[in-house]
A protein has these predicted regions:
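Generic serine detector
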Residues: 3-4, 42, 56, 85, ...
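Secondary-structure boundary elements
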Residues: 1-55
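Hydrophobic/aromatic-rich core segments of domains that either
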Residues: 12-14, 62-135
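Alpha-helix N-cap/loop-to-helix boundary motif
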Residues: 49, 53-56, 98, 102-104
Length: 135
C-alpha cells in the first residue's frame, strides 16, 4: 500500500516547490472521479483509490492527509453531517425522492495547517460534479 502512495507522491511532487507540490497533490486527488466504492472506504484500504481510479470523500482525504504530511503539513480530519436532499442540485424527480428518503450522511474533509492557520481543504468534488452544482 505505502509503495503506491510513495510512487504517486513522487510523481506528483517531483521538482516542485512547496506550494506547487501542495497544489498539485490537491488537484490530482480532487480530479479522481467521485464514486462510492465501499471496498476502499477504510483506513486499511484507501490506497486502492490509486488503482481503482475513483473514490468518495473518505479515501480521497485519507490519501490527502498522507501526502500532505509527507510535505510537512499538519492535518486534522473534520466530519460534517449532511443530507443529500439539502444540496442545491437539480435532481431528476426520481433521484430527488431517493435523496429525501436518505438518512443523514457524514462527509470527511481535512483541515490543514498552512501559514499558522487551519484551512479547510476538501478534495471531494471533481470537475464533472462541480459542473452539476455540487459544492
Amino acid at each position: 500500500m505505502t509503495s503506491s502512495i510513495d510512487e504517486k507522491f513522487e510523481e506528483w511532487t517531483c521538482g516542485r516547490r512547496a506550494v506547487e507540490a501542495r497544489v498539485a497533490v490537491f488537484e490530482k486527488i480532487r480530479d479522481i472521479p467521485y464514486a462510492v466504492a465501499p471496498g476502499i472506504n477504510s483506513a486499511l484500504h484507501y490506497a486502492r483509490i490509486l488503482t481503482v481510479g475513483k473514490g468518495s470523500c473518505t479515501p480521497k482525504h485519507f490519501l490527502l492527509r498522507d501526502m500532505y504530511e509527507k510535505l510537512g503539513l499538519p492535518v486534522l480530519y473534520v466530519v460534517y453531517p449532511f443530507r443529500w436532499s439539502d444540496l442545491e442540485v437539480d435532481y431528476p424527480a426520481h433521484l430527488r425522492k431517493l435523496a429525501e428518503a436518505m438518512p443523514v450522511s457524514h462527509h470527511l474533509a481535512c483541515r490543514v495547517e498552512i501559514g499558522g492557520r487551519l484551512v479547510l481543504v476538501d478534495a471531494t468534488v471533481d470537475s464533472p460534479l462541480k459542473r452539476l452544482g455540487l459544492p
